Amino acid sequence: MSATPPNKKITCNVCGADFYPSDKWQIKKEKLLLAEGTDAHRFLIYACGTYQKSDVQVIDFGGINELRPFLKNLVEIMENFSKVKTLVIARDAETNVKSAIDSVVSALKNVNLPVPQEPFQFSSNNHIKTALMFFPGPDQEGKCRNGTLEELCLTTVDDAPLLKCVDALLQCAQKNNEDLKHPWKSRLYAYLAGKDDHAGKKLGQAAKDKVWKLNHAAMAPFKKIIQEM
């Protein structure tokens, strides 16, 4: 049986885009962790495994502009959502963490879900509790900062001698007029290219193969939320 009516269409009341709910998955657990994209999805699956959280269902909600219609589908159409007790959303902060936070908050308000006062904190009503996580996580003062999951992954291996070689390579590339539009992605995949048996792997596959240190201090805020789900 399909999880949603196959011909049901949702139109986002902000961007006007049509969204057709997927019938390829169903809500199977009471704790949902929504991840932005394939890499974050796989990364968080292995993080949950590392933290021994087998009662969490990790779901890829797509790109950042797809969260709003995805939540609308999840809350209003998907079977078994009434049984969900915890919902956590994880995405990149990108170049403007305030804008990223505002976007997720707006999506939660649109479907009348509780809104946490700050990222990495829970908010709840009588039915469900929610939390927001932004990669690469908070700074030393506890404030969320700009960045991506790639930055977080590399932070977990910040003591690796190979990173000095990677940085030298990227500096050389920039001196030769190579415009690195996504420096953290360039750094991460250059790092993987220099690792035996890991060249060409995606971030999520590297997580499965234990390249990233998921018990590193930089993972502590994420670990705390996942364990408290």
Regions found by a protein language model. Give the residues of each.
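Conserved nucleotide-binding/hydrolysis micro-motifs of P-loop NTPases
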Residues: 39-40, 94-96, 138-141, 197-198, ...
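Generic alpha-helical structural element
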Residues: 33, 141-142, 177, 207, ...
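Hydrophobic, Leu/Ile/Phe/Ala-enriched alpha-helical segments that form helix-helix packing faces
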Residues: 48-51, 78, 108-115, 157, ...
